[in-house]
Amino acid sequence: MTEYILLLIGTVLVNNFVLVKFLGLCPFMGVSKKLETAIGMGLATTFVLTMASVCAYLVESYILEPLHIEYLRTMSFILVIAVVVQFTEMVVHKTSPTLYRLLGIFLPLITTNCAVLGVALLNINENHSFVESIIYGFGAAVGFSLVLILFASMRERISAADVPAPFKGASIAMITAGLMSLAFMGFTGLVK
């Protein structure tokens, strides 16, 4: 049980996919201008990333390895991610039309988020068990959402601040992301 908690903490804080492994930078920079959109993207990504980790583990264990076609891993995981995103979109559309309208554009964008594919591939490369795959995927998603929401709230505050002209826009956003990355480096010794 302790190793699962350490895996979760390590994935969320120590080995954050955005700030340490630099995966998912496109939605991190593109969707973080407003807090509401960052929360919507974070929730949708959390569900998809967790489900994609589970499905990728099952595809690897029960299809690719028994048939000795591991070389199709990347293509099959991309297909799995697309199916999970489409399934998520259909379920959200049927069960909660309000949430579907809120998340509208964000659900299809998750298919192109490299963090989702990265988590699925790293799960297999690190030989995680089924439960560890779930925890790793969920932890990566929570870490992504945490960083995205924190960054969006900082960008909203910075947009109201008096920033010098050369630093406005993407420049101050990159500086802020760098400072966030430095702050998360403080967690480095927390988990081995």
Swiss-Prot record:
It comes from Vibrio vulnificus (strain YJ016). Its EC number is 7.-.-.-. NCBIfam families: PRK05151.1, rnfA. It is a multi-pass membrane protein. Its main location: membrane. GO terms for cellular component: plasma membrane. GO terms for biological process: electron transport chain. Pfam families: Rnf-Nqr. The chain crosses the membrane at residues 5-25, 39-59, 72-92, 102-122, 134-154, 171-191. Part of a membrane-bound complex that couples electron transfer with translocation of ions across the membrane. It is found in: Cell inner membrane. The keyword Zinc-finger does not apply. Keywords: Cell inner membrane, Cell membrane, Electron transport, Membrane, Translocase, Transmembrane, Transmembrane helix, Transport. Belongs to the NqrDE/RnfAE family. This is Ion-translocating oxidoreductase complex subunit A. It is an enzyme of class 7 (translocase). The keyword Chloroplast does not apply. The complex is composed of six subunits: RnfA, RnfB, RnfC, RnfD, RnfE and RnfG.
